[in-house]
């Protein structure tokens, strides 16, 4: 506990909030190139083959990014757009690839939450909404 005299001399240091997505450098999204596309298994209670890509960003940093949705067209040297947002059961994966932007295709036959997966409006959905 500092004395009043010590506080007058030095003052208190402000604690700076550390960002959870450091590689974005305060940008909402970043462009990058896939260096490796692979699948990994999640942490203990869960079981699956999660699709992940290693991405080299335009600022020179390399990060692991999750590929959401069913099926994807990514391969090495694909240009992708990434956003922040971790995957809780994959250690070290703190970013998501944005579907439907740049080289990443949207999820095919997606009916709900289409904007999150870059899916275009199908004619069937259009007819239902008009009625």
Swiss-Prot record:
Annotated GO molecular function terms are: rRNA binding; structural constituent of ribosome; tRNA binding
User: Is this entry keyworded rRNA-binding?
Assistant: yes
Answer yes or no on keyword RNA-binding. yes
Entry GO CC: small ribosomal subunit
Q: Name one GO biological process term.
A: translation
3-methylthioaspartic acid found at: 89
Which of UniProt's keywords are assigned here? Methylation, Ribonucleoprotein, Ribosomal protein, RNA-binding, rRNA-binding, tRNA-binding
Read off the InterPro entries from this record: NA-bd_OB-fold, Ribosomal_uS12, Ribosomal_uS12_bac
Q: Which NCBIfam families match?
A: rpsL_bact
The record ties this protein, via PANTHER family, to:
30S RIBOSOMAL PROTEIN S12 FAMILY MEMBER
Known function: With S4 and S5 plays an important role in translational accuracy.
Family assignment?
Belongs to the universal ribosomal protein uS12 family.
Subunit? Part of the 30S ribosomal subunit. Contacts proteins S8 and S17. May interact with IF1 in the 30S initiation complex.
Q: What is this protein called?
A: Small ribosomal subunit protein uS12
Q: Which organism is it from?
A: Karelsulcia muelleri (strain GWSS) (Sulcia muelleri)
User: According to the entry, what is the taxonomic lineage of the organism?
Assistant: Bacteria, Pseudomonadati, Bacteroidota, Flavobacteriia, Flavobacteriales
């Amino acid at each position: 506990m500092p004395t009043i005299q010590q506080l007058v001399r030095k003052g208190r240091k402000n604690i700076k909030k550390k960002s959870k997505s450091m590689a974005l450098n305060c940008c909402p999204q970043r462009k990058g190139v896939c260096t490796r596309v692979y699948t990994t298994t999640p942490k203990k209670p869960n079981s699956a083959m999660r699709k992940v890509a290693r991405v080299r960003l335009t600022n020179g940093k390399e990060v692991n990014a999750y590929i959401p949705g069913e099926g994807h067209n990514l391969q090495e040297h694909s240009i992708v757009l990434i956003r922040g947002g971790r995957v809780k059961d994959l250690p070290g994966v703190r970013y998501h690839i944005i579907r439907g932007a740049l080289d990443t295709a949207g999820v095919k036959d997606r009916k709900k939450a289409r904007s999150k997966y870059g899916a275009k409006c199908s004619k069937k959905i259009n007819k239902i909404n008009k009625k």
